[in-house]
């Protein structure tokens, strides 16, 4: 019982902490983070213009697709909001447990269903969703466009051709230059969003494990709920009936002892 209470306290603490982190990370500039091309200090996208390579006509990546940046930003924000909602839900369920007797509309079977199915399933689902949204978003956040010197020969800002650019959409020369300038400016600024995101992800994993351990002791069979409730209320009497009851019938002679075994009634 003490371990269960400690687990509940730890889950409540983690839930509050993750709710606070979720609120602070919702408004992070995810588009700027992706434009910086850095992940945990490692440069994953090279958006710096090398004029020597440019003049020689060598292909080099210059483009992050803003469509996927927007999708990724929304995906992460939705993941954070969903994570916060699940944490609040699990927190409410845990806090209601001691006061369950005051809620007449919540029966034991309903509460067992909420604990067993809802909390355990959603705690695992949120971690999977968060990992997928972050991983897929990171994979799709950037599409490289190979640009040659001839692609910039036109000064009217015309779109690039399919032969020189391999991306989901076409874009103009000024658009590329604007992206390069903005990415260079953003790269010089420290970005803490990824660190907060990673911390939130690990806390999600810890919380999911703790919730799974906490509610793993509950039997999934709802049909024996009444029988287990009876055993809980009659624990003191059931301890005496461990398997068989022995009645000793003794006579005046010490070696004349009769024993009778009575099978317990279930």
Swiss-Prot record:
One of its GO terms (cellular component) is membrane. Its main location: membrane. It comes from the Eukaryota. The keyword Transmembrane helix applies. It is found in: Membrane. Keywords: Membrane, Transmembrane, Transmembrane helix. This is Putative uncharacterized transmembrane protein DDB_G0290203. It comes from Dictyostelium discoideum (Social amoeba).
